[in-house]
């Protein structure tokens, strides 16, 4: 190849790479019932779903349920403004439900004795695009942490207890 072709080819490849769409992502700030920041959750598209990276602090130790809820509101102290679980397909609750589960259902995570949790979860039933399963649909959603572990089957919320932290998911 001639020396002048290599820079032109490199420029063309760089333009193609940088013009590709980047994966959608967003950060969510979580607050407790008193309005205090208890951490950040990073969301990004991964495969056919959304990766959920938790960086949390000042939470009660133990296992906790976590779900995407349908309404982008987090009015304390009970966070009921977040509405029910995100459920665009009208299914029952629980990853172990024989009838399918809410799109917003996820596995439990554990908070350590110091009140911290750094964990990565995944929700294969949601996305960050623009269809009915998008966490951004209808103006957004909320992500809610519950006081107890989700039993993965009891409708409508897995007996996971009170809502103890909440963050709004928007673009």
Region annotations inferred by a language model:
Residues 1-10:
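Bacterial N-terminal signal peptides that target proteins for export
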Residues 16, 20-63, 68-171:
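N-terminal leader/targeting pre-sequences
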């Amino acid at each position: 190849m001639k020396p002048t072709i290599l820079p032109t080819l490199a420029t063309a490849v760089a333009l193609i790479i940088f013009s590709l769409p980047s994966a959608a992502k967003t950060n969510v700030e979580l607050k407790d019932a008193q309005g205090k920041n208890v951490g950040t959750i990073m969301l990004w598209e991964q495969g056919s779903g959304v990766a959920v990276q938790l960086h949390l602090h000042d939470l009660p130790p133990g296992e906790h349920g976590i779900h995407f809820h349908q309404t982008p509101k987090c009015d304390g102290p009970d966070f009921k403004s977040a509405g029910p679980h995100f459920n665009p397909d009208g299914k029952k609750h629980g990853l172990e439900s024989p009838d399918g589960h809410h799109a917003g259902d996820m596995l439990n995570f554990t908070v350590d004795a110091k009140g911290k949790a750094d964990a990565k979860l995944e929700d294969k039933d949601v996305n960050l695009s623009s269809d009915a399963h998008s966490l951004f649909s209808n103006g957004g959603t909320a992500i809610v942490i519950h006081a107890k572990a989700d039993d993965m089957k009891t409708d409508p919320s897995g007996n996971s207890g009170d809502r103890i932290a909440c963050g709004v998911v928007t673009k």
